[in-house]
Amino acid sequence: MEMKPKYDPREVEAGRYEEWVKNGYFKPSEDKSKETYTIVIPPPNVTGKLHLGHAWDTTLQDIITRMKRMQGYDTLYLPGMDHAGIATQAKVEAKLNEKGITRYDLGREKFLEQAWDWKEEYASFIRAQWAKLGLGLDYSRERFTLDEGLSKAVKKVFVDLYNKGIIYRGERIINWDPKARTALSDIEVIHEDVQGAFYHFKYPYADGEGFIEIATTRPETMLGDTAIVVNPNDERYKDVIGKTVILPIVGRELPILADEYVDIDFGSGAMKVTPAHDLNDFEIGQRHQLENIIVMDENGKMNDKAGKYEGMDRFDCRKQLVEDLKEQDLVIKIEDHVHSVGHSERSGAVVEPYLSTQWFVRMEDLAKRSLDNQKTDDRIDFYPQRFEHTFNQWMENIRDWTISRQLWWGHQIPAWYHKETGEIYVGEEAPTDIENWQQDEDVLDTWFSSALWPFSTLGWPDLESEDFKRYYPTNALVTGYDIIFFWVARMIFQGLEFTDRRPFNDVLLHGLVRAEDGRKMSKSLGNGVDPMDVIDEYGADSLRYFLATGSSPGHDLRYSTEKVESVWNFINKIWNGARFSLMNIGEDFKVEDIDLSGNLSLADKWILTRLNETIATVTDLSDKYEFGEVGRALYNFIWDDFCDWYIEMSKIPMNGNDEEQKQITRSVLSYTLDNIMRMLHPFMPFVTEKIWQSLPHEGDTIVKASWPEVRESLIFEESKQTMQQLVEIIKSVRQSRVEVNTPLSKEIPILIQAKDKEIETTLSQNKDYLIKFCNPSTLNISTDVEIPEKAMTSVVIAGKVVLPLEGLIDMDKEISRLEKELAKLQSELDRVDKKLSNENFVSKAPEKVINEEKRKKQDYQEKYDGVKARIEQLKA
């Protein structure tokens, strides 16, 4: 298959994905003897198109599953999408509002038709984006959280938890969105710092003897106050506990109670208790059996309990109430105060802590089981490990979970109320005498259904489902650290509760994609980046490699066009290296193993050794999900070792007359390039398929090719030392040429004073490389080379590299250069000495590491002595 002179991602990627899908390459293996590897995609919301965070998330998943497929696993990467209750409903309502229509105008059934239309439209966008990213998904198993099968799972879980007493209906403080008129989960509340005020009021004692000072940021809620609390250890208030105060405006008597929740050092040390409008106040109210007085309605307007403020918006009420208190001389002071205020992620409304009758999941036992499971062999491994502490901490302090939502789009709660008796019936099927019952109109929190995602997508609750039996539990979950609480934790406790097993073995957590300046990407800042635009410009492979290798697990990623472009340059380098290799391999070249009986050159042995080292490194790091380090290892090997050195060195035999040596070089080129493509494939699926198809190969696609394996027979340790010596000499000569302004095209005499006879022999045997890369007019390699008085000398591991300078150099400049080199070597010696004199390092570091530092010291000392001697020689 022909490779064009220039890498064009559009040409390379066009039609490739469709071919993979059509040929069924992403379907699980029919060989059931294989070990399985499963990842279920974190389902994107059908609210819109995918962003860079989704691209990062799914790229990591695809890399893992492609690699596991190549390693011989029966691999399933299962796609799906989330109905995203409030988020999607808000989008659909906004679209209707543009036409002057509300959901109530349409009614529930017609509105849901509109929502399903929205889902179908955006699901097709998402699939197209998955395709452009090259995700190896098995579309025959695609799931949606409102699918019939998943709905069945949701109903079963709800009913089972209700029958166990874990799900209950009750009154609690929830996050209330007065604009969308629904309860919200914590993740749907965005906290923002807002400029507000601290209002300090007088609450007069009922006996007329003075007042107690109370501070609040929400004066409108004081209309629902039912007590004042102070800390029992606060000496200031010991004598007033048990007394009463008069609630301003309302006139209701409030008891002063003792509760250790109160912070003695905060404010006046006394706080008002409004159980119906604050979570902490509600819990205090429960302890002291206080009345719950709700003073607002579901629209955020004051109700009949607010007296003369009835019908006012809550914020208008705040202003008027403060003015009224000023008139009564009950305002002590008003302080400017910046505080965190929750806003609805969807509507933008200020969220109201609100006492409401909702459905809840009792979390104590579920959380305990999740924590206990982490102490067993069935534990889940977190990457990075520090996030296990985050998970444990949340589970230890968990509150009951509000699962009902006042929406239409979602799983309607499978509970019915008898029209006459009020009896509650909960079941997977509706009551037989349905005419006597009214179903609960609320739907379940989106996270309730997505918490079942790892097993509901595989056929559960049908325990005989082939997919469930074969592919559950899944192997890895890849997701952002920002949803450990809201999704990861819930999948864990639901998986344990309903399957008695962890839902996944590993959790790989990544951070957020940020703008280059570190700020969060957002529409309001206008700094968002559409991944599809990046793909159109640079190709999917460039974006994927950047996303995968640009960060380490658990850390945020800063998007950089410059870095994506540098990956594009890297792919161009690979492309050009592949074209050279293919042109020299020839069309008729057959797939052959490396002939170890043949005369492998130093370059051949070295590149094969470095290849095997890279295979080992990449495999090991990938198993630890250290893809940033994988990227560095691949880049260094491909760019430096293969393209810059081996390809150039291979031109020596390829331009020579030794046909046997040419054939060996072709074999090594082909073998190395083939293995490079296999290692790169999970990261860059498109360009590697294109190049691999052009190489001599077996099989239909690189997707199904085997992962490279380390071959001990192709590791030649001694080649590394020799190559290191040659490369250092070549770099030294080139650097010296630059310093004396002598181009590489100009032949100059070069002398190499070898450190010993063994090195002299080795360098002489490999002088062809020195001739090619250094372009000498004469090359003299010997242990007893005489160094001319006027010469440029570089001290290297192998000895000294000497360029006679007669007519080439200014002596004063050369002395200055050597003195700078001497200072640099002294700095390195000081660094190594400091390390080796550090008792902590010497006692803890492996012996191999310590010996390496000692070797470095010896090398630096030898270089230092040589440079110093040369300076003295020139000065003499």
From Swiss-Prot:
GO process terms (BP): valyl-tRNA aminoacylation
Positions annotated to bind ATP: K523
Domain of life: Bacteria
EC number, as in UniProt: 6.1.1.9
Motif ('KMSKS' region): 520-524
Record InterPro entries: aa-tRNA-synth_I_CS, aa-tRNA-synth_Ia, Anticodon_Ia_Val, M/V/L/I-tRNA-synth_anticd-bd, Rossmann-like_a/b/a_fold, tRNA-bd_arm, tRNAsynth_Ia_anticodon-bd, Val-tRNA_synth_C_sf
Listed PROSITE patterns: AA_TRNA_LIGASE_I
Cellular component terms per the entry's GO annotation: cytosol
Uppermost EC category: ligase
GO MF annotation: an example: ATP binding
SUPFAM superfamilies: Anticodon-binding domain of a subclass of class I aminoacyl-tRNA synthetases (SSF47323), Nucleotidylyl transferase (SSF52374), tRNA-binding arm (SSF46589), ValRS/IleRS/LeuRS editing domain (SSF50677)
Job description of the protein: Catalyzes the attachment of valine to tRNA(Val). As ValRS can inadvertently accommodate and process structurally similar amino acids such as threonine, to avoid such errors, it has a 'posttransfer' editing activity that hydrolyzes mischarged Thr-tRNA(Val) in a tRNA-dependent manner.
Subunit details: Monomer.
Name of protein: Valine--tRNA ligase
